[in-house]
């Protein structure tokens, strides 16, 4: 009697059944390939017991219905001690169960020594009915259970057991195993070593681990790979870490053939018989149309569209082009003129030349046309197009003559000199040079020069003092995280600090900031600067923050830098606005050199008011209307300004020429002059 399968087999899959994925079904006869989840319907068997879920089946041409709805038999698995009393179908971990044909009891297939479904015989009898005792079964399972003892993890144990089966079937019989080892022990040893290498390569035991195990099982089955393993030419480490193409030469050759075939199919080919270009795509072969290939069966109405109808107008020929010996185009209107007699002979010669030149070039296009008069008419369209193209080429050559573009003046990067002090730690003299900023490039065109000069002016406006102190310290990690986020909404400006005095103090501060992973907070930052830091930067560090890598020329740079976080797209008021220099006294002849600072405030307030700068008005200055707009002269200054006010403004504009085209900058300059103690009359 053939083996019965319980309905338990398809009610829950045990985790160890994943070993079945690694079994090669090609190694077994076709009649042995059957599923444990469904009952077999092989008509060749003389007897077949169906479960209550199997339905009807046909045997020897007669339809029978399974009326055997009896209860499932008793569970009696002596190796593991499972009985009907302690057996729970949902929580059982023993795997597939099989029924004895003699006593109708159920046992675990693996407890009976059947590791896979392929090893279960057609006619099964349990260990009691067959006369096998438990000692014999335990002895047969010693070698197969050794892997489970070494590999506690079920997944790893299943993969290792699958490798054991592969090695057993593929190790040649002619191979002499080492002393004290047979084929089975050698297979177990190699399987454990190979699984260990896979686990090292992918310790997560996920899909990547499973796919790698399957691919290696396929490789091991190849005779050339097994030969390399036996000879010691290929180690398990190399087998796991190398791509399959390097392990199997046949697979590499196949991949090369596939790659070359793919390239060949993507190349356009020409059919010599049909004169057509063919492109092979995933949709099949496509014919690529060529303008030079004319179809013989094209409608004559389509052909007439390409004919210039001016060729048929003999009475008043259209404007043509006469080509001289130097191939330079010249026009002929073909109109009656007083000079026709003088140029008539030249026209006749040129027409003969044009007719002979065009005869060969247009013979293909005019083939098959009904009229023979077309052959004598020159193709004017091509000549006109050639003339237009030549004319454009000449204009391009003329525009390309200026080889170099004159760049505007580039401001010097040296912007500051003074002293930096870290109280009770270090102090040194230094200079500051603008080094880089956000979106900065080396100035090679006028736009980049303008950007460079703008950031130089901003840097000068920032570093307006002679002495700066380190007011505090921040952790570099927190500062880097903050700067990585703020770089998208602010501009970063880096000024390189170079030592001019007390090099030891400079080096001491640099090493402190770099080794202690600190950032110094600088004093004296203007209102438009959000933060000012002093950084020790090593551009060769692999852990260089992303905001520094994004800046130009920072990779590989080493030194002390002042970093300023500025408002996005900030426009400086000019490099000389904050410069407190005494004006030339010749510009103020109408003023006394002994004027006091009290005289300046009313003057500036009046100027600011008249210019719309919201100056503070004194009691003796009366405002008639809030919307008063003073008349403006041609030079851009209000005509209501007094001589003293005009003279004062003239001196400021001479000192700061950049405000001449920027009225708002002039107002800001006046406001700054008002808020300082400096007086131009001292």
Curated annotation (Swiss-Prot):
Residues 1-93, 309-381, 576-599 are annotated as: Disordered. SUPFAM superfamilies: Elongation factor TFIIS domain 2, FYVE/PHD zinc finger. This is Transcription factor BYE1. The gene is BYE1. Residues 1-14 have a biased composition (Basic residues). Residues 579-596 have a biased composition (Polar residues). Belongs to the BYE1 family. Keywords: Metal-binding, Nucleus, Repressor, Transcription, Transcription regulation, Zinc, Zinc-finger. A zinc finger (PHD-type) spans 74-132. GO terms for cellular component: nucleus. Negative regulator of transcription elongation. Residues 335-349 have a biased composition (Acidic residues). GO terms for biological process: regulation of mRNA 3'-end processing; transcription antitermination; transcription elongation by RNA polymerase I; transcription elongation by RNA polymerase II. GO terms for molecular function: RNA polymerase II complex recruiting activity; RNA polymerase II transcription regulatory region sequence-specific DNA binding; zinc ion binding. It holds the Pfam family TFIIS_M. Residues 155-275 form the TFIIS central domain. PANTHER family: TRANSCRIPTION FACTOR BYE1, TRANSCRIPTION FACTOR S-II ZINC FINGER DOMAIN-CONTAINING PROTEIN. Residues 57-67, 350-368 have a biased composition (Basic and acidic residues).
């Amino acid at each position: 009697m053939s083996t019965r399968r319980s309905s338990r087999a398809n009610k829950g899959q045990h985790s160890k059944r994943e070993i079945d994925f690694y079994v090669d079904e090609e190694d077994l006869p076709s009649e042995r390939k059957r599923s444990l989840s469904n009952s077999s319907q092989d008509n060749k068997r003389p007897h077949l017991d169906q479960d209550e879920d199997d339905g009807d089946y046909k045997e020897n041409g007669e339809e029978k219905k399974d009326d055997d709805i009896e209860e499932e038999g008793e569970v009696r698995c002596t190796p593991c001690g499972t009985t009907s009393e302690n057996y729970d179908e949902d929580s059982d971990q023993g795997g597939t169960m099989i029924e004895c044909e003699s006593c109708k009891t159920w046992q675990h297939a693996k407890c009976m020594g059947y590791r896979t479904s392929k090893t279960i015989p057609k006619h099964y009898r349990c260990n009691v009915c067959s006369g096998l005792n438990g000692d014999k079964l335990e002895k047969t399972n010693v070698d197969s259970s050794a892997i489970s003892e070494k590999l506690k993890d079920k997944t790893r144990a299943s993969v290792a057991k699958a490798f054991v089966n592969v090695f057993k079937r593929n190790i040649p019989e002619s191979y002499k195993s080492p002393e004290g080892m047979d084929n089975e022990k050698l297979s177990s040893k190699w399987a454990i070593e190979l699984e260990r290498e896979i686990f090292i390569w992918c310790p997560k035991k996920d899909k990547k681990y499973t796919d790698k195990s399957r691919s290696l099982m396929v490789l091991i089955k190849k005779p050339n790979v097994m030969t390399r393993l036996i000879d010691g030419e290929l180690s398990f480490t190399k087998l796991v870490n190398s791509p399959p193409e390097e392990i199997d030469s046949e697979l590499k050759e196949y991949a090369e053939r596939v790659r070359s075939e793919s390239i060949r199919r993507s190349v356009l080919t020409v059919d010599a018989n049909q004169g057509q270009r063919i492109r092979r795509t995933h949709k099949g072969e496509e014919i690529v149309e060529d303008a030079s290939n004319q179809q013989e069966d094209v409608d004559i109405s389509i052909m007439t569209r390409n004919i210039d109808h001016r060729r048929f107008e003999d009475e008043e020929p259209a404007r043509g082009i006469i080509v001289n010996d130097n191939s330079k185009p010249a026009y002929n209107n073909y109109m009656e003129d007083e000079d026709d007699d003088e140029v008539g002979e030249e026209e006749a010669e040129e027409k003969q030349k044009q007719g002979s030149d065009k005869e060969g070039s247009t013979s293909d296009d005019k083939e098959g046309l009904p009229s023979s008069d077309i052959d004598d008419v020159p193709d004017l369209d091509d000549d006109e197009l050639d003339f237009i193209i030549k004319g454009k080429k000449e204009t391009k050559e003329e525009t390309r003559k200026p080889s170099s573009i004159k760049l505007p003046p580039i401001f010097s990067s040296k912007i500051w000199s003074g002293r930096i002090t870290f109280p009770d730690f270090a102090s040194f003299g230094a200079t500051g040079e603008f080094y880089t900023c956000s979106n900065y490039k080396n100035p090679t065109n006028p736009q980049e020069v303008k950007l460079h000069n703008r950031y130089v002016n901003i840097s000068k406006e920032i570093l307006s003092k002679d002495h700066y102190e380190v007011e505090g310290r921040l952790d570099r990690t927190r500062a880097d995280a903050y700067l990585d986020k703020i770089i998208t909404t602010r501009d970063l400006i880096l000024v390189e600090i170079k030592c001019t005095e007390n090099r030891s103090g400079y080096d001491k501060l640099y090493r402190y900031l770099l080794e202690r992973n600190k950032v110094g907070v600088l004093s004296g930052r203007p209102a438009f600067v959000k933060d000012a830091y002093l950084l020790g930067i090593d551009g060769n560090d692999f852990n260089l923050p992303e905001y520094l890598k994004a800046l130009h020329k920072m990779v590989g740079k080493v030194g002390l830098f002042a970093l300023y976080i500025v408002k996005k797209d900030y426009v400086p008021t000019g490099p000389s606005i904050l410069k407190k220099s005494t004006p030339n006294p010749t510009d103020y002849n109408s003023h006394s050199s002994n004027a006091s600072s009290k005289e300046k405030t009313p003057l500036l307030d009046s100027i600011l008011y008249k210019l719309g700068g919201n100056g503070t008005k004194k009691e003796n200055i009366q405002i008639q209307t809030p919307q008063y707009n003073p008349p403006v002269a041609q030079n851009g200054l209000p005509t209501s300004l007094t001589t003293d006010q005009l003279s004062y403004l003239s001196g400021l504009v001479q000192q700061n020429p950049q405000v001449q085209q920027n009225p708002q900058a002039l107002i800001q300059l006046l406001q700054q002059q008002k808020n300082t103690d400096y007086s131009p009359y001292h």
